[in-house]
From Swiss-Prot:
The organism of origin for this protein: Methanosarcina mazei (strain ATCC BAA-159 / DSM 3647 / Goe1 / Go1 / JCM 11833 / OCM 88) (Methanosarcina frisia)
Assembly notes: Homodimer.
A Pfam short name: tRNA-synt_1b
GO cellular component annotations of the record: cytoplasm
PROSITE patterns from the UniProt entry: AA_TRNA_LIGASE_I (PS00178)
Name assigned to this protein: Tyrosine--tRNA ligase
PANTHER family cross-referenced by the UniProt entry: TYROSINE--TRNA LIGASE, CYTOPLASMIC, TYROSINE-TRNA LIGASE
Amino acid sequence: MDRLELIKRNVQEIVTEEELEGLLNKKETPRAYVGYEPSGKIHMGHVLTVNKLIDLQKAGFKITVLLADVHAYLNRKGTLEEVRKIADYNRRCFIALGLDEEQTDFVYGSDFQLGAEYMLNVLKLSRAVTLNRAKRSMDEVGRAMDDPTVSQMVYPLMQAIDIALLEVDVAVGGIDQRKIHMLARENLKSLGFETPICIHTPILLGLDGTKMASSKDNFISVDDTEEEIYRKFKKAFCKMGDVEENPILALFRYHIFPRYETIVIERPEKFGGNLVYNSYSEMESGFAEEKVHPMDLKNSAAKYINEILDPVRKVLL
């Protein structure tokens, strides 16, 4: 897999691919970033962007991870002291998941977002962005707000200035970040900054086939125990032969196959013995043809996800 193919793997959108190709031709070591609001446990939805950062490192990028403690504070996720502690937990999780620590700069928002230069640029940007535009950007990231605070309207402006002052070439995020990233692309040039390239990953469904929500217990946290993961997978949605919006297949596609060249679905000999797959498309076809039972797929997924998360558990003990 060449450099560009690695970057494009498992992404929903690149804005724009032409600009990305130009960047790769111009810079040997470009810089990409993701900002994480430290507001709770890291789950497999977050890990999707971590996987993309690992791909980018393999493609020669230097990575910046913004641990956005000020953003979390503005978004009412706790005191600055509380979110700083969660940010440190996030950092340890990301390293345990495979980010090369030597090729990653971890930056706390509070280290640079409270300075005069930063705030002046936020104020300049606020003159160019309407209130409705800022609100629409935030509605995509979280739940729609009927009565937002001023701090929540400042949030997307800060995210755009983060991209500028961290001096990154590429902004990475889930597709829910698209409106904020487009705000940055449309306005940073007028403030004297470069226009960022944006890479967006899909939003994964919860294990029950609906949107992930802590109240539903339908997602995998990186510090879940082995027993918890097997329990969650056992009751996960996985209809026989159905490859559309199948959360178990999605875990294989986005989390397992990028880390393993070969996947073995273990089965007793009386049910045909083990199945070996060398690509996700091969596995998807096998499941569509009902060659794989949903429970065998679930058990195999749980086994591999536990292997991936085992280093995280060891770090957090």
